[in-house]
Amino acid sequence: MIQEYFKKSLEKKWEPNDIPENIFNQDCDWPYSYIDFDADFDKMLKEIISLEETYFVKHRDKDKLNSYFHEGWNAVTLHGIDSTKTEHFDRYGFKTQEDANYVWTDVCEYLPTTVEFLKSLGYSQYDRVRIMKLNAGGYIMPHTDGKGRIFGPFNIAINNPEGCNFVFKENGIVPFKKGRGVFLDLGREHAVWNNSNEDRYHIIVHGHINPKLLNDSISHTKNTHGHN
């Protein structure tokens, strides 16, 4: 099933039109915008791999029964309730983020380069920040994260093995590569398949976005899309 879905989705292609006045608007047709970073992602990857057996936990394991299926999806939280709580605070009985008391978690001491980079993004407030691992051969079946436009989660590729793809059903492949951060509209149907022999590591940042970072990503997408 995942093979057929990807075959159809990869036939689709999105090209950016005029720069939107407000990329968060419900009628905006941009599924993503991206920016490329000049940072030591090889060093970050080494830090992250060192956490392997000790800290990564299965992410959204209950969704295999109650929602969409996935295989080989693991995570560790860098900013949140604690390193093992990888889902939204309401899954753990909290009514607000303030009650959940998000903090930079204990694993951050093992990831100095990674955390320094994340703090340099200039968010005025960090919400959940997680490393998401998709095992070699792993996949996340087609789904949406909710109704309407859900633009803003920032997905940064620490690595992105050849053969590992994130696709939108109606917009085709998202051009991830090592060192590229992508703001995504997760209200659109999407799926991920790591059809490679290498584990994939991305970081997802939620929070109050640095406006300059977002605007730079929009301009960068408009100027470079289809060229790299």
Residue map of PLM features:
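Non-heme Fe(II)/2-oxoglutarate
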Residues: M1-L118
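A short glycine-rich, His/Asp/Glu-containing loop-to-beta-strand
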Residues: E116-A136
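A short beta-loop-beta micro-motif enriched in histidine and acidic residues
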Residues: Q125, Y139-P153, K169
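Short, conserved beta-strand element in jelly-roll/cupin
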Residues: K133-N135, G148-G163
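A short hydrophobic beta-strand segment most commonly corresponding to one strand
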Residues: G152-I158, G181-F183, N197-N215
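A short beta-strand-loop-beta hairpin characteristic of the jelly-roll/cupin
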Residues: A157-K177
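Conserved metal-binding segment of the jelly-roll/cupin
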Residues: V174-H190
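Asparagine-centered strand-capping/turn motif at beta-strand->loop junctions
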Residues: A191-S196
